[in-house]
C-alpha cells in the first residue's frame, strides 16, 4: 500500500513537472519571437548574420557538452524515495557530475574563445569573430546549469528547469536588446554591436546557471539538517564507478545529437 501511494505521488509530481516544462517552452517561444524583430531592426541583416554564426557554433558545442550528461544523471538518480541513504548517494552523483561538467565547460569555452577567428572563417563570416568570443563563456554556464538540471530532473522536480529556461530567455531578450541598443547609439561598428547582443545571451545563460546552482545549494543545506550522523547501510559507489555509468548512458546520446547538429551546421555553411 505504501509503495502504491509513493508511486501515485511520484506520478502526479511527474505530470505536474511535464506541465511546467510545457508552459516554460511556450513562454520561451513567445519571448524568442518578441526578441527577433527588434534585434533585426538594430543589427540589420549583416549584424544578424554575425549573431546567427556565433549562435550556431555555440549551439553545436553545447550539444556536444551537455546533450547526454543530464540524461545520464537523471537515469542514475531516478527511482529514489528521498530516504537519507538516497540523499547521500544523490549528493555524490551530483558532485562527480558537476566536476565533469565544469571540466567540459572550461574546455568548451576555451575551444570557442581562443580560435574564434578560425571558427568565423570556417563558417564564411570573419566579422562574427567578436560575437563568437562574446558567447564563449555561455558554454561553461550551460554546462553548470546542465548539472543542476540533471540533478533536479532525476528527482522528478521539473520546476527549477522550467524557471531557469524562462530566466535565460528573459535575459537574452532584455539584456541582449539593451546591450545592442547601447552599442548602436554609441556608434559602435556592426560586428561589435552584434557581439553586444550576443553578450546578452551569455548574461542570460549565466543568470540561469547561477539561479539553478543557488537553488541546488539551498536544497542541500535543508536536506543536510535531516541527515543522520551515521552512514547509510550500504557502501556508496566510488567516483570511477559513477563516471563509468555516466559515460555508458551519455556517450550514445551525445554522439547521436552531435551528428544531427553537425548536419545542421553543414546545411547553413
Language-model regions, residue ranges each:
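N-terminal membrane topogenesis motif
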Residues: 1-31, 88, 233-253
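Signature of the first transmembrane helix
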Residues: 12-71, 139, 251-267
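Interfacial transmembrane-helix starts/ends
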Residues: 15, 52, 85-102, 243, ...
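Helix-loop junctions and terminal segments of transmembrane helices
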Residues: 67-82
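Alpha-helical transmembrane segments of multi-pass membrane transport and lipid-handling proteins
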Residues: 95-121
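Alpha-helical transmembrane segments of multi-pass membrane proteins
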Residues: 110, 114, 125-148
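Membrane-interface junctions at transmembrane-helix termini in multi-pass inner-membrane proteins
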Residues: 142-164
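Hydrophobic alpha-helical transmembrane segments
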Residues: 164-178, 187-219
